[in-house]
Each structure stands twice: as C-alpha cells, then as structure tokens.
C-alpha cells in the first residue's frame, strides 16, 4: 500500500510516525512518500509537485497535512483522484470557497477529516453511556485552548482549535440535531506569523436542538486546557453530569467522570475512567494512530471502521460553522503581542508537548 503525505512539516511528520508504527507493528507493507517545497533528510521518496506524485507514485491514500491556508489549493489538485483522502483539520480556511471542493473530490473512494478526540477511549465510553441510557442533553460547555503565541506554524486562527470541541458536542449527542450558533465574541491579534489581526479567541453560545451550549476556545491560552462538561436528564428526569478532560497532564492522557446527586445533595459517582497510554513509539500519537490504522485497514482490507469516519459532508458542515463563527465574531481592536523590532518564534525542534 502506498501513502502520500502532502506537507512533511510538524503535522506531516506526526502522520509519518503513525504510519511507520502501524507498518512495523502489524506487518502490513506500507510505502510512504511525500510532497514538499524542498527535500528533507528523511529517506522517503520526494516529489516537488502533487501532480507528479499522483502520476508516478500512484498512492492508495493521500494525507493532506500542509498549513491551513494551503488546504484548499492542495485539495483542488486532487481532482480526479480515486483513492482515499485523510485531511488534517480544519478542512479549509474561512476565506476559501467550499463549493469548489465538492467537484474536486467527487471521485475519491473515501474521505476522513482528522478529528482525533473521537478516538479517545474516554469519549467513546461517554457516547456509549449516553446512547445506552437514552440521556437527553440539557447543557454543554467547553474550554478548549493552548498556547500558539509566536508559533512558527502559519494558522487560520482559533477556528482550527475550536473545531474539536464543536465536533465533540455534536458527535456525543447525534440525536440532538445540528449545532446552531447564537452569538460569538472574539479577539484578534498578532499572536501568529499569519497576520496582525488573526482571530485568536472566541466565546460563543449555541443551540443543539433544545440544549444550550456555551464555549470558550483560544490559541493564546498560556496553558493547554481541554475540557467538555455536559448535563443530561435521564428517563426519570434525574440530572446527570459528565466531564471530559483531554491531554492532561500529557497528550493523550484523558479522563471521564459521570455522576449525579442524591436527594441530600451528596455526589453519587456513576462511572470514572482515565487513560494514560504509553505504547513505545506512539508518544503524542495514540489517538491519531487509531484513526490512521482504521484508514489503512479500510483501504487495504476493505474492513469497515469501528466508527464512521468524519466524512466530507461532516467536514463541510463543520467548516460552514467555523466560517460563521469567524465572520460573526464581535471583536474589539486587535491585541498586540509583538512590541519589539523582531518576533522571537518557537523553535521548530521544540518538544512535542510544547508544540501540541
């Protein structure tokens, strides 16, 4: 099986490591190549254009892991491609024309947007509890942030971060309907090399059917903080609470707590779970490798994934939500992080925990 990685930067190398681990641990013969602006010391076959790579390498899977602003141009270059496309989130930026992408990808055999938190054991357990007990969502809130100040990687802004939380709320409660934004406040700044007025933070209200959602997401959170809180009612109108905590204290270390309160107000724990995976070779990659493994098995063995991929329709639906969020955000004058003559960027060889 041949896998082409378009963009072998930080994200692309994460995919490379994941696929190489899958090959070594499963025995599946995977052949990797990449497209980039310049050749790197990787030992992998290199192509300087997407068109040439598609013709010469003929990949079964194409991974799109270029920076946010290059997603749309690269996806359009896949017009006529008949293999499987695995795309880093978000699908495109708020400035791109979504309608032009449908035609470009109409012949692909499959598509998956990389929404890795769906592949957390904690997330999957909560989804099963909600479904099994027929809980009805009443409220949801999230805080989803990390520090991307002076990061060397270009970005379209906080829409690339908030997509995880917005997707999770809907994915956990699929029967509740489609998420609708009600209001958005935000802040723009020069935190990124991508410009002086990039949206770095949003605070939003939304509706998911009869449930109400509040959320905060930021690329200038000075610590990584990823939590989702949900309140439900069960068949007996009893209030149930659940909290998901992701990537704390380390990447892929996730926790779930589900509880209610008795008549006296005392907390009654219903379920508690935590995961701290430490499989060698998968540092920061445990959830991503699950997605990659399912893509490989779907293509190579025609094996249905354990859960449906976040397909192109889902990616477009989420992107329209992000576009509305970006355009509707009420913002004050931009904040300034750069006060000296030059910007000091985070080094490309920084540790994975800092970059994540």
Residue ranges and their predicted role:
Residues 1-42, 56-57:
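N-terminal Rossmann-like dinucleotide-binding module
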Residues 43-105:
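Beta-loop-alpha module in the N-terminal Rossmann-like domain of NAD(P)-dependent dehydrogenases
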Residues 69, 92-152:
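A contiguous active-site-proximal alpha/beta segment in oxidoreductase catalytic domains
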Residues 149-229:
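Rossmann-like dinucleotide-binding domain that binds NAD(P)(H)
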Residues 213-291, 308:
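NAD(P)-dinucleotide binding in Rossmann-like oxidoreductases
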């Amino acid at each position: 099986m041949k896998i082409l990685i378009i963009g072998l930067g930080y994200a692309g190398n994460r995919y490379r490591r994941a696929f190489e681990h899958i090959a070594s641990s499963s025995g599946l013969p995977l052949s990797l190549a990449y497209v980039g602006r310049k050749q790197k010391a990787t030992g992998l076959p290199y192509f300087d254009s997407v068109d040439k790579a598609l013709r010469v390498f003929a990949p079964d899977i194409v991974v799109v892991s270029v920076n946010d602003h290059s997603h749309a141009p690269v996806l359009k270059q896949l017009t006529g491609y008949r293999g499987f496309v695995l795309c880093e989130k978000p699908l495109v930026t708020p400035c791109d024309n979504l309608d032009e992408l449908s035609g470009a990808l109409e012949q692909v055999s499959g598509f998956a947007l990389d929404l890795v938190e769906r592949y957390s054991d904690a997330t999957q357990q909560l989804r099963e509890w909600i479904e099994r007990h027929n809980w009805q969502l009443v409220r949801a809130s999230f805080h989803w942030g990390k520090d991307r100040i002076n990061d060397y990687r270009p970005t379209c802004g906080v829409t690339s971060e908030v997509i995880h939380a917005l997707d999770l709320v809907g994915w956990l409660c699929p029967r509740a309907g489609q998420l609708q934004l009600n209001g958005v406040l935000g802040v723009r700044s020069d935190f990124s090399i991508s410009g002086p007025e990039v949206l770095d933070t949003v605070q939003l209200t939304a509706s998911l059917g009869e449930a109400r959602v509040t959320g905060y997401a930021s690329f200038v959170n000075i610590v990584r903080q990823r939590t989702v809180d949900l309140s439900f009612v069960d068949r007996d109108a009893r209030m149930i609470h659940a909290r998901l905590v992701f990537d704390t204290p380390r990447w892929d270390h996730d926790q779930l707590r589900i509880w209610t309160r008795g008549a006296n107000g005392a907390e009654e724990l219903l379920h508690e779970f935590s995961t701290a995976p430490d499989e060698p070779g998968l540092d920061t990659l445990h959830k991503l490798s699950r997605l990659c493994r399912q893509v490989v098995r779907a293509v190579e063995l025609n094996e249905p994934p354990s859960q449906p991929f976040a397909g192109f329709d889902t990616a477009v639906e989420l992107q329209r939500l992000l576009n509305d969020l970006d355009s509707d955000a009420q913002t004050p004058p931009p904040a300034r992080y750069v006060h000296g003559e030059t910007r000091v960027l985070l080094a490309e060889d920084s540790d994975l925990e800092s970059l994540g």
